[in-house]
Amino acid sequence: MNRIMGIDYGLKRIGIAITDFLRITASPFDTVKNVSLKKNALKILEIAKNRDVSIIVLGLPLNMNGTEGGMAETVRKFIEKIKFLSDIEVTTVDERLTTVQAERMLIEEADISREKRKGIKDKVVAALILQTYLDIQSDE
């Protein structure tokens, strides 16, 4: 069984998480710099190929009322670019409050300083996005 990749697509950084081969746990993997839609998509697809990923799950940033804001449009453009370059399956999950949850985890549970959180937060958010997807799949 191939792995699943979770992505937190941000304006400056892209957080990446990957499951184990059994698709049970989501683990933070890496954070890459956001360069351009095409370069970002190529980098993600390269990692996906090297890590035997068959599904990519992106967090879709929704407003608290459930509507899509400007960043959701950017995420959808990124999805279009990935689909243009590859036939890998791409899906989304609601990522509302995952950044807040990650911040809280890193401060309260891991006691990580603000400076160190910058480099870790994005991939932790990606892991939360991916775990949300896994939880939804296990409920179906």
UniProtKB/Swiss-Prot annotation:
An example of a Gene Ontology cellular component annotation for this protein is: cytosol
CDD domains named among the record's database cross-references? YqgF
Q: What is its EC number?
A: 3.1.-.-
A biological process (GO) of this protein is: rRNA 5'-end processing
Any Pfam family matching the protein: RuvX
Molecular-function annotations in GO:
nuclease activity
Which family does the record assign? Belongs to the YqgF nuclease family.
Q: Which NCBIfam families match?
A: RNAse_H_YqgF
Q: Tell me, what does this protein do in biology?
A: Could be a nuclease involved in processing of the 5'-end of pre-16S rRNA.
Q: What is this protein called?
A: Putative pre-16S rRNA nuclease
The organism is Endomicrobium trichonymphae
